Amino acid sequence: MSAKKNSHLVFENRKARHLYDLLDFLEAGIVLTGPEVKSLRSGHASFQDSYVDFKQGEGYIVGLHIPPYNNAGYVIQNPDRPRKLLLHRQELKMLASKVEQKGLTIVPLKLYFKNRKVKTEIALAKGRKLYDHRNELKKRAEAMDIKRELAARHL
C-alpha cells in the first residue's frame, strides 16, 4: 500500500517569482469558512495582485480571490475579503519590522492542503525593476546556450 501524501498543492503564484526577488520563506495557516475550503478543494482561487498587510498586530492576506462555492446554500461570502494569517507572535513581529523597510513586501507563493488544513507559503520579497527582468532573461538564455553546446559536444 502506498503512503499517503501529506500535502496537496492547490495554487501557485508563478508570477511572483518573476516580479520579485524572494528573500525569506514562511508557512502560515489561513482562517477560512467551510464553503471557502470546499471552493478551494474544487480548484477555484486566484492570487492576482495579492499581498500580506498588517493591522493591529495581525497579518491578513489581501487580494486572494476565492469564489463562492456553488452548493453553499444561502451563505453569501465576499470572495475578496481579507483573510487572517495564522502565525506565531515572533514571526509576525519579524515580518512587520522588515516590511517597514523601503521596497520590501510580503507575497503569497503557494496555497495547499497539509494534513487537511489549508496552508500558504509566504515570502518576504523585494520588487524587481524592468531592467532586472531583462537581465534575468539574458542569464537564462545564456545558460540554455551553454547547456546546448555541452549536449552537442557529448553526442
Swiss-Prot record:
<dbReference type="Pfam" id="PF01668">
    <property type="entry name" value="SmpB"/>
</dbReference>
<dbReference type="InterPro" id="IPR000037">
    <property type="entry name" value="SsrA-bd_prot"/>
</dbReference>
<dbReference type="InterPro" id="IPR020081">
    <property type="entry name" value="SsrA-bd_prot_CS"/>
</dbReference>
<protein>
    <recommendedName>
        <fullName>SsrA-binding protein</fullName>
    </recommendedName>
</protein>
<dbReference type="GO" id="GO:0070929">
    <property type="term" value="P:trans-translation"/>
</dbReference>
<comment type="function">
    <text>Required for rescue of stalled ribosomes mediated by trans-translation. Binds to transfer-messenger RNA (tmRNA), required for stable association of tmRNA with ribosomes. tmRNA and SmpB together mimic tRNA shape, replacing the anticodon stem-loop with SmpB. tmRNA is encoded by the ssrA gene; the 2 termini fold to resemble tRNA(Ala) and it encodes a 'tag peptide', a short internal open reading frame. During trans-translation Ala-aminoacylated tmRNA acts like a tRNA, entering the A-site of stalled ribosomes, displacing the stalled mRNA.</text>
</comment>
<dbReference type="InterPro" id="IPR023620">
    <property type="entry name" value="SmpB"/>
</dbReference>
<keyword id="KW-0694">RNA-binding</keyword>
<keyword id="KW-0963">Cytoplasm</keyword>
<dbReference type="GO" id="GO:0003723">
    <property type="term" value="F:RNA binding"/>
</dbReference>
<dbReference type="GO" id="GO:0005829">
    <property type="term" value="C:cytosol"/>
</dbReference>
<comment type="similarity">
    <text>Belongs to the SmpB family.</text>
</comment>
